[in-house]
Amino acid sequence: MLTAATELGYEGKIVCGLDAAPSFNTTYGGDCSNIYYINNINIDDPTTAEMAAAVEDKVSAVNKYFLGYDVVMIAKQCIEEAGLDDAAALLSAIENVKDFKGLTGTVTIDPETHMPDGMGMFMYTYDNQTPVMLEEFAG
């Protein structure tokens, strides 16, 4: 999208979702200063930064890795609580996840909507190719 916009002569700001988060900057290879994007992780958090450093050479999109990691760890916790023999008990465990401390934040599932409640998002831009957090939005 940035390549197409540049080729068309567009020089303004571009607001994106997770697809513009790193590794977009290194894949694109050019100045990304006009890109603004949301991310589900705070790359400045020490725990997140440590885990990101451990996996950045193994995965293409660290932020999406964190989401997947949290989903798997929530599933693990629910299976440990409810087992695999009773589908209703497992469903109840998933629907009632509360205060799970994950890499993307503290996750609580709303049993009525099945959506996570209270997860923050972070707005970033780039200084050339370096991510810069602008603001955290509480969930």
Which residue stretches match the model-derived regions?
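Extracytosolic ligand-binding ectodomains
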Residues: M1-G139
